[in-house]
């Protein structure tokens, strides 16, 4: 009886239901993922998120600020006094606020703070063009120097030397380059921390800076990207830093001397035209008005002076002399010996 109850009567409807159950079960089994595949996919999506959190870079402004800001921590920089000798590889001019250095040569820069920054603070270095017409462009190395470099950061102009903790970034929005290094407290007996920077392209390189002046910005930042202090200085990468510094400082002194002389002296009149100065009385005749004429060269000045003295003398005795001189009878004829040529 039990076997009879378990067996269903074989008909067209029961066979159709049985066939559908068999087909759906095999289809579901074929679509089911292999064991452990779902967990592997979850691990795959979790790793990039954690990597992005560890390498999170704060969004940089479109145009970085170039004003000096000491902040609450008294952030400041100090450069070595290398002088203007031809043998120096880097030298800083206080008068110009400008660093002169050679290509790929290490430049030590001292970092000073009055109060220690928070734990994990970093020092960020980036460069921008000085002139407003170029400030929107990214400062990077020329194609020639990039082709000679096989490193991952070959397009970056600024390198940090002597530290394995340096990190190089490229902002996803502005494409500007920057490099960070962790802030280290000064050693015993020292008031500052020294970082080593090198600039990997000349200022005159075609396709790179192309003789356009640049500014380097050093900022003291927290791990979240908050700026605690900022210092800015101009940089020129050249073959002879001492010579170029001496030349530019000399040009600055010459321009300053010329401006001082111009302020002390009266404004020079225009040499192309004679400027008419107003006379003391506005009712005087036009012939009595005084004019000023600037003359170049002493000999020419003496010649005009003698001419002017003669004219002044004629003005004093003018009426008598004019009466004694006979006028010609015609504009085309000259009087010779007091008789007509006819």
Swiss-Prot record:
It is found in: Cytoplasm; Nucleus. A motif (Nuclear export signal) lies at residues 302-313. Residues 68-255 bind DNA. Its cofactor is Zn(2+). GO terms for molecular function: DNA-binding transcription factor activity, RNA polymerase II-specific; metal ion binding; molecular condensate scaffold activity; promoter-specific chromatin binding; RNA polymerase II cis-regulatory region sequence-specific DNA binding. GO terms for cellular component: cytoplasm; mitochondrion; nucleus. GO terms for biological process: apoptotic process; DNA damage response; positive regulation of transcription by RNA polymerase II; protein tetramerization. Residues 236-243 are annotated as: Interaction with DNA. PROSITE patterns: P53 (PS00348). Residues 271-282 have a biased composition (Low complexity). SUPFAM superfamilies: p53 tetramerization domain, p53-like transcription factors. Residues 319-336 are annotated as: Basic (repression of DNA-binding). The record marks 86 as: Interaction with DNA. Binds DNA as a homotetramer. The N-terminal and C-terminal disordered regions undergo liquid-liquid phase separation (LLPS) following homotetramerization and activation. Post-translational modifications, such as phosphorylation or lactylation affect the ability to undergo LLPS. Belongs to the p53 family. Multifunctional transcription factor that induces cell cycle arrest, DNA repair or apoptosis upon binding to its target DNA sequence. Acts as a tumor suppressor in many tumor types; induces growth arrest or apoptosis depending on the physiological circumstances and cell type. Negatively regulates cell division by controlling expression of a set of genes required for this process. One of the activated genes is an inhibitor of cyclin-dependent kinases. Apoptosis induction seems to be mediated either by stimulation of BAX and FAS antigen expression, or by repression of Bcl-2 expression. This is Cellular tumor antigen p53. It comes from Xiphophorus hellerii (Green swordtail).
